[in-house]
Amino acid sequence: MEVKEEKSCSIGEGEEAEGKEAKTVLGIFTREQFIMLCVGLGLIALLLIITLTSVFVIAKSDASVDVDMEPFPSDGDMLDFLLQTGEIEEKDGLYATWYHAANSKSEMSKALNSDVMILEADVNVQGHNTVNETNIPIMAHPPDIYSDNTLEEWLDAVLKSKKGVKLDFKSISAVEPSLDLLRAKNQTGINRPVWINADILPGPNVPEFWPVVNASEFFELIQLKFPDVTISPGWKVLYLSIFPNVTYTRSMVEQMYSTIRHLPQKITFPVHALMAKNGWPHLSWLLSQSSRYSLTLWQGKENPTLNDLLFIRDNSNPQRIYYDIYEPVLSQFREAAKIKDRPRRFYPGGDIVDYFRPADSDGLNIQWDTVNDKDSLLSLLEDSPGGMLVIPVKSSDGHPNIPIIDGSEMPLKDCLDLILASTKPWGIYLQIKSQNQLSLSLELLRQAYDIDLLHHPTWVNMDISHGAVHIQGYMTGEEFLRTVDRIFPHVTLAPSWPKEALVEGYTPEMLEPMVQLFHRAWQDVSLQLQAEALDRSETWRLVLVQPRFSLTVEHQTENKDINAGIESLMAIRAANRQRSFYNIPKMYREHITDLSVRK
């Protein structure tokens, strides 16, 4: 007992000594107080870390959190907007991405939480075409006429993000209340492009009686209620794999243009991706009507081919084509499009200035050479950097159904095969003498095009009889056009007059009917003129004021007069260097170049 008391006393004295020592920790706290302080600070730091992490994760996953947006007009360019928000690094429609049918709240949330840049959603009115129909815009694609998401709720959520907006209207009754909502939202700033889409015309594989959105009412409401948008007027389309060649026709495209040409807004035309290549002559014409126009390629269940997509890209301005295409095709397409020095998939009816890209865009800087036989062709393919190859075509003496190169026995097919196998930039100029050879030659071109080999500018020339020129033995202009359109229309038309008709030069009686005839064609047209006949007339000036028309001056090699037609030829150059071309010998070309430099 005593021992215990002594020990207890010793312990008590020790604790007292330690307590005195503890008071010296930082000169303020006891050990217990210091430990408690450290634990408390640690808990506070841990709580801050957890809180900040939670806020960051929620902000990232909850698309309803407001994003600060710089001011941007709702009718502004979509690519400019994506550049401004940092979504893309260059102004190229290839890099814009889309989310389809972001209609229900769950799909909308999924779209907002994704990395896509533009949300596309369908708008109708609640209970459309039923006794329960209201004027409340909802997000639903037919046959759905009810939704858990109204347009107002959709806009409230989407406008807190930095996504672009495309609204696809399924009925005219949804348009007015939707535009009222957009106008109201814009009071505080939509700050992103808004695209307004509706199918207003029947398109490929769709009968005329099929219901579409009334175009006149659609456009009138936009101008009245909320004109600050990009308009996306489309065709109602049905793609059928059993009819793969059905496409947008000339009449469909011209009808669309006549319907929208009065609109002041930016216009983007939605085009089915599987039908775009075959309809390209008409679609490219539509694009050429205004710099405000663009195309948006979209797809259904079937995937477009990479070759078809590359064809569209290689024949258009990258700022004017959008690709609403699904993965994995979109990524594959992007990779293929970025390959340097890949062969260009040029449209054979395209502009040779665009193909050859000569210095100063001057047609004189495009080289022309004539193919006389196999040896001359091989020499040109080996030694020349590229240019237009003039190929005179006639019938084989023993085989009238086999077109050959005039002056040799080389079949035209063999000639074309060698040209198409070359990696150099070549244009094809077929100089055809008879109607039979026209059909056979066009058939060879069609075959090459169908197997995806013909990616060269291709011109078809014939002396034709038309207007004041009625000379026995020559094909009529109307029959020439019909034959080309029937067999292979994807060419530049290069008609010329029989030499017997040029005694008085190119008179108005000759030229004006020819221009009128070919003005009806949808292809590019280059009228062929003989240099020695030019000085007898200046009627050629009529041609260069026509859209899609150009002039090609030919100088016969047997004519040694270097100054033949030179005055008119220089006048043609002065009028338009991009739309005047020169199928002339090297000596004559150098002479013109020298004269041009002096001037």
Curated annotation (Swiss-Prot):
Membrane spanning stretches: 39-59
Pfam families assigned to the protein according to its UniProt record, in alphabetical order: Menorin
Principal subcellular localisation of the protein: membrane
GO cellular component terms, A-Z: extracellular space; membrane
Membrane topology summary: Single-pass membrane protein
InterPro entries membership: Memorin
Annotated keywords: Membrane, Transmembrane, Transmembrane helix
Subcellular location: Membrane
Family the UniProt entry places it in: Belongs to the menorin family.
Protein name in UniProt: Protein FAM151A
